[in-house]
Each structure stands twice: as structure tokens, then as C-alpha cells.
Amino acid sequence: MPILDELHWRGLIHQSTDPKELSEQLAKPTVVYAGFDPTADSLHVGSLLPLMMLRRFQQAGHRPVALVGGATGMIGDPSGKTDERQLLSKESLAANVEGIRKQLGHFLDFTGPNAAVLVNNFDWMQGFSFLD
């Protein structure tokens, strides 16, 4: 069963833009990504749906990319908070990313022809001064 049909069957797609084009794109190997917040060394239940979507896409022959928001995670999400978030140290961030990487390895295959990739936005954003 094509991945798009499976996702519809499971009730995981409410609506999409240009379903015909999407179906054509997903008929060949493509890259999909989901982002994860490394403000803790472990994923939480809110990460389960995007993680399972990455797994399903990988099982269908696509390459999953797990984007860890290391730069944005250092700053934190202030929504719903009255106090300013404390910046994470680079050491804490690295430990959190490593913990998440290990957990992702239980769901995603990081070897093989459509190996999952883990990227960290800290790697390309660390030189920007707004993180200082």
C-alpha cells in the first residue's frame, strides 16, 4: 500500500495541498523530516507521532531526517512561562542531543540505503551572535 494511502487509512492526514502531486512525489524515494527539542535528555510523548511518521516513511523507502533544535533548544520555548528561560550550556545540550539520538535509534535505522540522518541546527547556527 502506498504510504499516502496508508496514512489516510490510519486517519493521520486531515488535509493536504495538491494530493495528486504529493502522491507522485511519494511514489519515488524522498526525504522527510521532523524536529525534536533537546531541552531534556529524553523525548516525551508529544514526540511520538512525528517519530512514528518518520518510521513509517522510512519503512516505505524514504529517508527520514531527525532535526534536533540545538540552537533553538539552548534558548528554550518561553510560551506559557512567566519567567525567562535559562540558557542551556553547550555541555548540557550535547548530553541531551546524545540521549535523544539513542532513543531515536530504537525507532529509526541509521544504516542502509535509506538511513536516517540526525542533524542539529546548532551546527550551522552557532556562529550567529544572537546565541551569545
Regions from the PLM with identified roles:
Residues 1-132:
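NTP-dependent nucleotidyl-transfer catalytic core
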